[in-house]
Each structure stands twice: as structure tokens, then as C-alpha cells.
Design a protein with these regions (language model features):
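Domain-scale detector for complete catalytic domains at protein termini or as standalone homologs
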Residues: 1-87, 94-255
Length: 255
């Protein structure tokens, strides 16, 4: 399905497609594995943004619009005849949400469910008033990355590894900073799909409740033990996949 999408377990006859959007600086491999965790009724498609993995020679995206445009151009034919859902963690929560909004506004299409993780709603007040992480100097930026967690020590302690790791991360953080500061809460919810927020209990506080203002559909919050990258813990990852699977089973019975 194009260089944008990594699908380890292609299932053309699946009833539902789960599209997973990467965290800042992330690639597609973590989510592509999920295809092996779901049954034959679900096809997992992991988004691969420019500047990483097989797209490492391509320039990074410069704006949220650029990401949305590419995702929709590639995915639109796959979205028009089959149920689909979105999942996004951290930066991926914003890219998946923004893509869902554009799909509904321009094409009348909407995911059956939006799963967002590890992120405040884009109109959360403190996001608009906090210091832009993309404007931190290299030392401060690395200190912030370390505080968030999730980055292996062998990368943080290796200068050459950091030279490969930090550029895509910083590029995504620039997109994030510009997106949240230009986002104004709409007068009415832009989405009508169900929305679930996942979060780690030890992560920094997120304004999860504000996500409810962005959809007229069902809304719930589900927390798991751990910090910002709680989903990298095998037990949490299993719980996350189980939660999504149960929702998809219910959706498929109603198709």
C-alpha cells in the first residue's frame, strides 16, 4: 500500500483496518508487529513518515497539512469500502486526529473509532502556553527527551546514534509545536466517532477530558501503569491490544 504504509500481515479479506500513527521520531516497526496479535478479521497498517526506515533519504515533513495530505492521498482508496479505525500515541494522537477531521470534512469519511494515547487534546490551554520544545538548544532538548523516557540508554549515550535519532524527532516536534499553537477548538465537535484515551498513570498530567469536546460520539478514558511509553511494556501492550480487539469484535458484530 505504498511506502507510507508498513503492513507485516496483509489481510485483504479483513473486516476492519487498524491504522497506527507513530510517536514523534518514531518509525513503523513497533505497530507493524501488531498484525500478529490480532485475528484474521483485522489488518494492521502502520504509518511510515518520510525521513525514517526505508524513507530515510526523503526530507522530513514540514507541517501537519503535509502529513495529512500524504496519508489521505495514499489511504483514501482503502478507506471507502471497509470499516477502519485509527490509533495514535503522543504525536501520533495529533496526526491521527487531524487526519480523521480532514477525512470527515472533505470526504464524509470517519473512523469507526479513534484511539488516542499519551496526549492532551490539541486545544488544552497549557499546550498553547508552554515553551516550544523545538526551540530548545541541543542540550536542553536532549535533557527533555531523556526525561520523557522510552529511549534506550545505548542511544542516549552514543553520539553517533543520537545524530540519527534526534533529527526525525525534532522535525516531528516542530510540526507538533506549530499545530497545537494554531489549533482552535471548533464551535461544535468536528467528529462523531467514538473516542478512547489511553494514558500511563506515571506520565505527566494530560488534559484527557478535553478530547470529549472534539467528538459527539461515546468517550472513555483507560489508564495503564507506567510512564509516557507505558505501551512498550509487554504486559501493557498486550492489554492495549486486547482492549482494542474487544472493541473491534463488537463493531464487527454490528456490521
Amino acid at each position: 500500500m505504498d511506502k507510507l504504509v508498513n503492513c507485516f500481515y496483509g489481510r485483504p479479506d479483513a473486516l476492519t483496518r487498524l491504522f497506527c500513527f507513530p510517536w514523534a521520531g518514531g518509525g513503523s516497526l513497533f505497530y507493524a508487529r501488531w498484525g500478529g496479535f490480532f485475528d484474521e478479521s483485522v489488518e494492521v497498517c502502520s504509518i511510515r513518515l518520510p525521513g525514517r526506515e526505508s524513507r530515510s533519504s526523503e526530507p522530513f515533513t514540514q507541517s501537519m497539512d503535509q502529513i495529512i495530505d500524504e496519508v489521505i492521498t495514499v489511504l483514501l482508496p482503502q478507506l471507502q469500502g471497509k470499516s477502519f479505525v485509527f490509533f495514535g500515541h503522543s504525536f501520533g494522537a495529533f496526526t491521527s486526529f487531524a487526519t480523521a477531521v480532514r477525512l470527515k470534512e472533505k470526504y464524509g469519511l470517519e473512523p469507526a473509532h479513534l484511539f488516542v494515547s499519551g496526549a492532551s487534546a490539541p486545544h488544552a490551554k497549557f499546550l498553547h502556553s508552554s515553551i516550544k520544545k523545538s526551540e530548545l538548544n541541543d542540550g536542553e532538548f536532549l535533557k527533555w527527551v531523556t526525561s520523557v523516557g522510552g529511549t534506550p540508554a545505548e542511544i542516549l549515550g552514543n553520539k553517533e546514534a543520537l545524530q540519527l535519532f534526534l533529527p526525525p524527532l525534532k522535525a516531528d516536534v516542530i510540526v507538533f509545536d506549530n499545530f497545537v499553537r494554531s489549533f482552535d477548538k471548533p464551535a461544535s465537535p468536528p467528529l462523531s466517532c467514538s473516542l478512547t484515551c489511553f494514558d500511563g498513570t506515571e506520565d505527566i498530567p494530560h488534559d484527557l477530558a478535553a478530547w470529549q469536546e472534539l467528538t459527539s460520539g461515546d468517550f472513555n478514558i483507560h489508564k495503564m501503569p507506567g510512564g509516557h511509553f507505558y505501551l512498550k511494556d509487554p504486559k501493557n501492550e498486550k492489554s492495549l491490544v486486547t482492549y482494542i480487539s474487544k472493541y473491534l469484535e463488537t463493531t464487527e458484530r454490528n456490521l
